[in-house]
Structures are given as structure tokens and as C-alpha cells.
Amino acid sequence: MQRNARPLELARWEYLFDGGSRERVIQYLASYQNEDGGFGNGLEPDFWLPDSSAIATWSACQQLIEVNATKDEKIVRNLVNYLLLSYNREAELWLTVTPEHNLYPHAPHWQYTKDVQSKWMYNPSVELAAYLIHWSNEESEANKLGWQVIEKALTYLQQAEDMGFHEINNYQKAANLLQDKMGDSKKVLAKIHQLAERAMNKLPDTWGKSYGATPLDLIHNKEDLLYHQYRNLVEENIVYLHKTITTEGVWNPSWDWGDDQLNFAVAKQQWIGIIAINNQQKLQIFQ
């Protein structure tokens, strides 16, 4: 990690696995926060927009939850304020990609085009709404906005026939954070379970050959209903993770930036640290 990770990921690794300080994680994470409270500046390595964005702020939220950040901490208060100000009232969610993304180096999947929001839908808005609720007082403006987005996101969920695994992850995180507060929680979890099962790549020979969801991308602990259903595949996925470690002891991303290999070389190095943390967490949970 010391050779391959940014200071932020190194601080996260030390916090998660080596008894490191949560304050160091927050310190490095704060360096990506803008004056408006949102996050940018390449926090998500696949786009280098310096301005605040929903996706970079979503990434920051996940890392703040990881260190058990509370609503009273300055970094969280400013983030909540950003979410209130950046909510798009016409679309009734936070825009995933904006025209400004195209002005800076970025992976092809972050290219802004007209009507691109129909591709992303509630990725990451449903999860951002859950964080807004988690870090706000009941009856506050932030809390009410969070529930307003959750209500619309749940309507969309129940109507969906299939869904990309990243958006499924958003719903999984939101459901985990809100627990039984999330409407008819059994109905919600059943639908998420159904969509996750459909999105999962169940063919081990094809893992890593295209960008898609392996079992461990959708099954997050041994209490998950899908774990009991696909335990053998989870075990194969663990073996796969061990097999795909490079000689340097890390994992490479399974995607690239197409023709922009020069800038991808920088992003790839940054992703290596993030992927190492994600995979080590998976191995700790299931081994």
C-alpha cells in the first residue's frame, strides 16, 4: 500500500486493518472537500473535475460512514449543506453527471450526454438521501428532503425489471443504513434481492474478462440471503481474488479509459489502493 496508494487510501488501510487513526482519514478526506461542502478534486479517480459533484460526494459519504463520522463534525455539516444546495428540484434527485465532467480528463463512462441521467437514475441519489437522513435531525429540512428522495426511489425500485449492479449497491447501502425505516422493508429487501440475483455474473470463467458484478460485488456478509443461496460461488470468488493478485501484491482495475491511456495510467495507480481496501474487506468478512 505504501508504494501503490494515495495518502487517503493508506490512512484508510491503517485505520481499517492496522489500528490507525480515524482523524488521519478525515484529515486527508477533507483535502478533497470544496468550500461549498461538496467533494471533487479527483476523489473518484475516474474523473478529475475539481468542482463538487454528486458522485465524489457519495464516495466521501461512504468513507465518512466507515470511520463512524457523526452529524456534529464540521466535515459532515458542510457536506449536508452541499446536498441541500445541489439537489436538482426539476429532476428530483442529485444529477449524477453534469456537462462540466467533460471539461476534464475522465473515463468514458463518466461522459456527459443529453438524457444521460436516464442511464444512472438513482445512482447515487438513493444512497445520498439515506446519508442525508442519517446525518440530520428529524423534522429538519435535510431529513425531509432525504425521505422525499427515498420515496421516489422506492417507487422506481419496485417498477424496475433489472438494474446495474452499482445502482443495486446504492439501494443495498441505503437499506442497510435506514433498516426498517425504509417503507415496507421486507418488500424492499425482496426486490433488491431479486435484482441482485439477476445482475450477478454466475459464470466464474468469465470473471474479469468484462466489466460486471461478481458474487462478492453484491453479497456483502454471511447474513445475506444470497450468501446461503450462492455460497459455493462466493467461495469460488474468494479463490478468484487470491488468483488475481499481481506479483506486487495488489489488484488491477478491470476497466480502462479507452484511447486515453496516458491519463488512465494515473487513475489506475490511484484505483489500485482503493481496490486493495475493497478486496481486503471482502476477504476478512468471508474467510
Tell where the protein language model's regions lie, with residue ranges.
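Preference for long, amphipathic alpha-helical scaffolds in soluble/luminal domains
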Residues: M1-Q287
